[in-house]
């Protein structure tokens, strides 16, 4: 019986076993396991499967998947390392360079951000996210001249894009170039003119220029439109102190404390901040947000 099995069935069984253990089959198996792990958010498992797959076969696609898995797992240095290796083989890929810049931004490696943006700009000078992120990196490194220059470049690429214009105005405000802030604010698209960010900057600008009556009017409008913006209550209270309105100051401080309490109850730790950080995040991390959700790459 065993003779006939070996004669007629043994070869088939052997071929099946060899096929199962072949590098190609094992590679496919590991990729499948990695996909399942990613779909279940088991990112460490996915990383392990993809690393094993890369040991079997070097592949740009596999390395890209591994970089993404590291990103999901919030292991940014490893993600950046693999993106660098991919870039060695895809040196003409502007999107890849932008992605490297974005990952470096999360790592607070602003020099690497600037380097990647410079390479990306040589490949694509029409993508507004590149000079915008380059400007942010320059600013973080104390290079305000180039920061302003790259934001002006954003304005040239997309004249009606709000975030770079607002960021330029904000940078100039921090540089105390108040006249230029006024000029840039004139460039803000009309539909954004009453946004929280713009109104707040205008109010702070009036305050910095010692025009307290105008500042008060702007804070009144700001709080009328955004009554839960805690920081504005605090700042308006300070103006009322300067204007000798002690009762008004007490009322605003009370409202400020109520807003903070409400935000704490709602689990919002960003009570005293504008939402411009989130708008900026959506711009210069747009590529990353296609891969990982906000809570996965904090």
What are these regions (language model features)?
Residues 28, 61-62, 95, 129, ...:
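Start-of-helix register in tetratricopeptide repeats
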Residues 52-53, 85-86, 119-120, 153-154, ...:
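Canonical positions in the second alpha-helix
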Residues 20-61, 65-72, 102-106:
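Alpha-helical segment of the N-proximal tetratricopeptide repeat
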Residues 57-58, 91, 125, 159, ...:
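Short coil turns that delineate tetratricopeptide repeat
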